[in-house]
Structure formats: C-alpha cells, structure tokens
Design a protein with these regions (language model features):
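ABC ATPase nucleotide-binding domains
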Residues: 1-26, 254-286
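Conserved ABC ATPase "signature" region
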Residues: 124, 135-153
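The feature captures the beta-strand-to-loop junction immediately N-terminal to the Walker
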Residues: 58-60
Length: 286
C-alpha cells in the first residue's frame, strides 16, 4: 500500500494571545434558528477548536451539527453570538478572502460540490476560479490526485462514482485552495473499512502539515481513531467534550463497540486494540 502523498505547504501561523496560540475556531454565545418564529437550533452555544487539532463533533440527527459547521463556514449567520476564525471575527473577512487559504467545507450533499462532466474538468475549472496559472494548475491538481489516491478517477463523471469515491474526489476539490481549516460533514460516509483507513492516513498527514479539522460524524469508531478532541452537541449546546479516551469511556450512548462490550471488565478501554492488549495482559497473569 502506497503511503499518502504529503501536502505541499505547511501552515503554522504564529499569532499569540496572552502567550497562547490563537484557536482555529472560537464560537461564543451563538444562537441560531432557521425560522424567525421557530425554536432555536443552537442555544447560546460556545465552542473552541484548537489550532492544529482534529476535532470530531457528534450528536443525534437534527441536533445542529451541520448547522454549527455552516455557521463556522460563514454560510449562515446566527442572530446572536460571536465567531472568530484564527482570532479574526468572521464578519471581518471581506469578499471571498475566507475561502482563499483560510477554510474550506466538505458538505453532506457531496454532489453539490461537482459542476463538471468529469473530475478533471471540475478540478481544473476550480483551479482557474482560484486564479491559478497553467503550471500551477498542473502542480496543484497532481498534488491532490496523489494525496487522495484518485488519479485513476480523474476522467470519470462524478455521478458514475461510488459514494466513497465521490467523497474522496470532493475532498480533493476543497483542498485546492490550500485551506488552514477543514470543515468536514460526514467525510467517511459511504466508505468501506479500507477507504476509511486511507482517509485516516490522509487526515493525519494534513494535521502533520499544520492543518486543523472540524469533523461532523456519526461514525464513533472513526472519530475515536482520528480525533484529538471529541464533542457532543445536545439540546443546542456542547454537552460534553474531551479526548476520545475520556469522552467515549464516560459516555453510555455515544461510545465505541469495544467500549460498550468491555465496560465493567476494562473500564476506560475504547478501542479494539486496547481491549485486546488488556485481555492478553490478563491472560499472562494466570
């Protein structure tokens, strides 16, 4: 199996606030509703994503996870609260500056990302829209093709791809602007176990290059394997957050299969690898 290609640019900004690195995302007291006369989807929600981490946001259907992602991306506006991206108020990013090297979003509706009759056409059109010259276009598209392992898909129509292949190609497209912050809505949807492992390698490679990722997911096993921090959105606010170890071991509903099976036997174990290791250690004691 080939190792994932390394991203070609390192993002490590040095802004400081009181000696601490500025968070990638700061959401403070945010409230949002779709209908003026309807109920709040987010209720005075506050949330922070540290620079350079992978944060997974979990919660039930309709809990507001995708809404929080869209607010972070500046696609919809809350009626109350403040959002900062890398220390700068969201409203202070003028024009399309937010989407040129600052952040990119992978939406849940993957097909909405594609506009061309082939992946290659789509990628090239987006490169031109970003103002790239011919040489840069070739370099950039080959970089994302190799990183996402989709060179063999470039001449295919997006509608002819499997769900997992569409995810990878859409992800490649949002990487073209070389964003510091990745907002990913269900990125492992439609992927088999092999493709998920490949995606995990890619995300860890991007993290190593300095990227930050906020990932909305229902896939607790994937979240446990990739996240630095997990957070639970419930009743319009962040109900719990922590490392995967503390988050999943303390949660009775949103937890891994390994954590559920081993509860009471190996408290605190949340991955299959941890349970296997503890089982072997116990056997060796007898």
């Amino acid at each position: 199996k080939k190792a994932a290609a390394q991203p070609d640019k390192i993002y490590a900004k040095e802004e400081q606030v009181s000696g601490n690195v500025v968070p990638a995302v700061e959401m403070t007291g945010v409230s949002f509703r779709y209908d003026k006369n309807g109920g709040d989807i987010l209720k005075n929600a506050s949330f922070t994503v540290k620079r350079g981490e992978i944060c997974c946001l979990l919660g039930g259907n309709g809990s507001g996870k995708s809404t929080m992602l869209s607010i972070t991306a500046g696609l919809i506006r809350p009626y109350e609260g403040k959002i900062k991206i890398f220390g700068k108020r969201l409203k202070d990013y003028k024009g399309d500056s937010l989407y040129r090297g600052i952040l990119s979003m992978l939406p849940q509706d993957i097909m909405s990302v594609f506009t061309g009759d082939s992946i290659e056409e789509d990628i090239e059109f987006h490169c031109r829209a970003l103002g790239m010259k011919k040489r840069e276009i070739e370099d950039r598209k080959n970089n994302v093709y190799n990183l996402m392992h989709i060179m063999h898909l470039k001449d295919r129509h997006p509608a002819d791809l499997s769900g997992g292949e569409q995810q990878k190609c859409a992800f490649a497209k949002i990487l073209l602007s070389e964003p510091d912050l990745l907002l990913l809505d269900e990125p492992s949807k439609g992927m088999d176990a092999f493709a998920k492992d490949e995606l995990k390698e890619i995300l860890l490679s991007l993290k190593k290059s300095g990227k930050t990722a906020l990932i909305v997911t229902h896939d607790v096993e994937f979240a446990c394997s990739i996240a630095d921090t997990c957070a639970l959105l419930f009743n319009g606010n962040i109900a719990a957050s922590g490392t995967p170890q503390t988050f999943f071991s303390a949660n009775y509903y949103y937890t891994t299969t390994a954590g559920r099976i081993s509860r009471g036997l190996f408290d605190g174990a949340v991955t299959a690898e941890e349970v296997i290791s503890l089982c072997k250690a116990r056997l060796n004691q007898h």
